[in-house]
Amino acid sequence: MWPKILLRGGRVAAGLCPALGPRLAARFPPQRTPENRLAPQRNLHATAARALPLIPIVVEQTGRGERAYDIYSRLLRERIVCVMGPIDDSVASLVIAQLLFLQSESNKKPIHMYINSPGGVVTSGLAIYDTMQYILNPICTWCVGQAASMGSLLLAAGTPGMRHSLPNSRIMIHQPSGGARGQATDIAIQAEEIMKLKKQLYSIYAKHTKQSLQVIESAMERDRYMSPMEAQEFGILDKVLVHPPQDGEDEPELVQKEPGEPTAVEPAPASA
């Protein structure tokens, strides 16, 4: 069986899934699998388990009368895709479908992806990542709230120069984790697979941050939390915004570094 490899702090609760229609927003009870016990309680950015909130409905006046959209479908018309909550196969399926649909409409117009996620299943996140790299559209990523674990990888995977964060967001990177059960041979097979995924994730972060593999390995050895400014210096994002462009302005207002604020110290390479 293919092992479900998660990044720590991944599947901690049922979250709000981006929906193409109101019927797609459903409550998924937590499954009693070993993965649900992997999320450490010390994770400050874990999403509390709760019932899904109601999805707002937007009513528009058209020449043929009123037309109602759920809020995510209305945002999709503006080429906005939301990645909210833990990333699993169902969230990945919805996000991939939206990306492919927007490319079919136009492969030149940018797509805006808003991320507020504690992370999740590695293979689900990589499915979204591969689709982002596959389509021809420029993808503008935005971190609102948090982009932890696989969420930070999707944030970094945006088009260079178009990766953004709001000023009070948090970004976190770390190595993958997983649970293995069964016979010793089965555990060894799954351990080998997670080590391969670890190297694969390191190379992806190195590609998009322009950091060396040695720096990436040292930074991701344990949970590494960053402010947006620190993530910008590390190479995960490009701009920290206060608000979008106003009328008559060409550029949005950027967060400027405070005088005397210490720079992010790069982790020293681990010595043998």
From Swiss-Prot:
- Keywords, ordered alphabetically: Acetylation, Hydrolase, Mitochondrion, Protease, Serine protease, Transit peptide
Positions of post-translational N6-succinyllysine modification: 196
Q: What is its EC number?
A: 3.4.21.92
Report the subcellular localization. Mitochondrion matrix
FT transit peptide: 1-52
Q: Which GO terms describe its cellular component?
A: endopeptidase Clp complex; mitochondrial matrix
Its UniProt entry gives the catalysed reaction(s) as: Hydrolysis of proteins to small peptides in the presence of ATP and magnesium. alpha-casein is the usual test substrate. In the absence of ATP, only oligopeptides shorter than five residues are hydrolyzed (such as succinyl-Leu-Tyr-|-NHMec, and Leu-Tyr-Leu-|-Tyr-Trp, in which cleavage of the -Tyr-|-Leu- and -Tyr-|-Trp bonds also occurs)
GO annotation terms (biological process): membrane protein proteolysis; protein quality control for misfolded or incompletely synthesized proteins; proteolysis involved in protein catabolic process
Q: Catalytic site residues?
A: 149 (nucleophile), 174
Q: Among its keywords, does the record have Endoplasmic reticulum?
A: no
What InterPro entries does this protein's entry cite? ClpP, ClpP/crotonase-like_dom_sf, ClpP/TepA, ClpP_His_AS, ClpP_Ser_AS
Region feature Disordered, mapped onto this chain: 240-272
Q: Please give the residue positions where the record annotates the modification N6-acetyllysine.
A: 207
Broad EC category? hydrolase
Q: Name one GO molecular function term.
A: ATPase binding
Q: Which family does it belong to?
A: Belongs to the peptidase S14 family.
PANTHER family per the UniProt record, alphabetical? ATP-DEPENDENT CLP PROTEASE PROTEOLYTIC SUBUNIT, ATP-DEPENDENT CLP PROTEASE PROTEOLYTIC SUBUNIT, MITOCHONDRIAL
Known function:
Protease component of the ClpXP complex that cleaves peptides and various proteins in an ATP-dependent process. Has low peptidase activity in the absence of CLPX. The ClpXP complex can degrade CSN1S1, CSN2 and CSN3, as well as synthetic peptides (in vitro) and may be responsible for a fairly general and central housekeeping function rather than for the degradation of specific substrates. Cleaves PINK1 in the mitochondrion.
Share what the entry says about its subunit structure, partners included: Fourteen CLPP subunits assemble into 2 heptameric rings which stack back to back to give a disk-like structure with a central cavity. Component of the ClpXP complex formed by the assembly of two CLPP heptameric rings with two CLPX hexameric rings, giving rise to a symmetrical structure with two central CLPP rings flanked by a CLPX ring at either end of the complex.
Q: What is this protein called?
A: ATP-dependent Clp protease proteolytic subunit, mitochondrial
